[in-house]
Amino acid sequence: MMAARDFAALVAGGLIAAASVFPAYAQDAAAVAPAAPANALEVELNALAPSQKGCMMTFVALNKLAAPVNKISFELAFFNDKNAVDKITVLDFRDLPQGKKRVRQFDMPNVKCEAVTRILINDTPVCDGPAAGECMKGLVTRSQISVPFEG
């Protein structure tokens, strides 16, 4: 009986010790994880949906730069399943106020959503306003769907 009680106390003590170690490990891991840059222009590929014209593309942009962008356009390259560029086009994202999220949709004629395997922001031909020159430098891309989105 005494051995069972000692064993139970030992197990309980071990669980308490383990529980006190793991939160510290999680905090250390979080401290080491890379943070998103403070001065960033985040552009997310949010959705691709078939449309009557071709493919409706939805993007979410967040301007974390130190200033607003009065007008911006992105040159996008669309890749197919052979990793070949199918189309290059320029999309006008209009203005991106500082600290604000904006949703932009583009109906791409003669593009089949299912044929798009990757999208690349090749350039920012227009980046006007106080943040001019920072658009490509601060660009951070991500995709909410299975199609990779790179910058």
Go through each PLM region and give its residues.
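Low-complexity, acidic Ser/Thr/Pro/Gly-rich terminal tails and inter-domain linkers that flank the onset
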Residues: 27-54, 58-60, 138-140, 144-150
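Sec/Tat signal peptide C-region and signal peptidase I cleavage site
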Residues: 21-26
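Short, solvent-exposed, Trp/other aromatic-anchored flexible loops in extracytoplasmic proteins
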Residues: 87-128
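Bacterial N-terminal signal peptides that target proteins for export
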Residues: 1-11
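The feature marks short-to-medium sequence segments in extracytoplasmic or secretory-pathway proteins
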Residues: 62-98
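Bacterial N-terminal signal peptides
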Residues: 10-20
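C-terminal structural segments of small proteins and small subunits
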Residues: 126-139
